[in-house]
Amino acid sequence: MGQKTNPNGLRLGIIRTWESKWYADQKDVPALIKEDALIREFLNENFSKAGVSQIEIERVKAKSKERVTIKLYVSKPGIALGKEASVKNKAVSTLEYLTKKEVILNIIEVRRPEKVAVLVAQSIAEQLENRASFRRAQKMAIQRALKSGAKGIRTLVSGRLGGAEMARSEGYSEGRVPLHTLRADVDYATAEAKTTYGILGIKVWIYHGEVLPGQSILDTRKPFEAGNQKRGQKRRPRNDQPGQRPQQRNRNSKED
């Protein structure tokens, strides 16, 4: 049977970049990879309610000791920061104790969580754990993603759907999701929903557009704006022609 490869790994080095950015001697690479996994596991567990979508790790070797810079992308920055940044400061102190290095944690807000595959998959998983219909959860996620500017989305839920004795898979698709086009910016993520009748697997593919030569992946994931109207620009009435002043209507005048 033909299997589908991970779209994120397939495009790595072509239109996507690495989430861990550092160089080290060959003897130090295994320890640093293990340390990266420890940092990601800690952040995902402690900031799970904040909606973590991506974690980027950069390492710089300073004179005194190594410095680790972490970019944490979340959909709810208020929960990640806490009152007077108490949650963030506590996480930084814990990471410095675990790694024995200087840690800088930058929390970045995700403006459109409706079209981020990781957050969409987590949202569907939470709804399934709360006994929501798997069909309704997928359809609502598709509608929100398309409304936020995604050009295509595909979802798939597998397991004992509805408590059935035999496991099966059921998914929905809307728009275009070109998996074989390497310049296509396809965001992919998985999640698990732990229900009373077993674990359900969720897969989400979201297509943001093509990354043309000279562009980056950030050009296809700009914040969505309704129509062609720019921020701060006033909308022109339909009946008025460009370059003409809109006709004012007198409310006191009576028509024959």
From Swiss-Prot:
Keyword Ribonucleoprotein found: yes
Assembly behavior: Part of the 30S ribosomal subunit. Forms a tight complex with proteins S10 and S14.
Organism from which the protein derives: Acholeplasma laidlawii (strain PG-8A)
Annotated protein name in UniProt: Small ribosomal subunit protein uS3
Low complexity biased stretches: 240-250
Every KH type-2 domain range: 39-111
PANTHER family noted in UniProt: 30S/40S RIBOSOMAL PROTEIN S3, SMALL RIBOSOMAL SUBUNIT PROTEIN US3C
Gene Ontology terms describing biological process: translation
Annotated keywords: Ribonucleoprotein, Ribosomal protein, RNA-binding, rRNA-binding
Name of the gene this protein is made from: rpsC
GO annotation, cellular component aspect: cytosolic small ribosomal subunit
Gene3D superfamilies: 3.30.300.20, Ribosomal protein S3, C-terminal domain
Family: Belongs to the universal ribosomal protein uS3 family.
Chain segments carrying region Disordered: 219-256
GO molecular function: mRNA binding; rRNA binding; structural constituent of ribosome
Tagged with keyword RNA-binding: yes
Purpose of the protein: Binds the lower part of the 30S subunit head. Binds mRNA in the 70S ribosome, positioning it for translation.
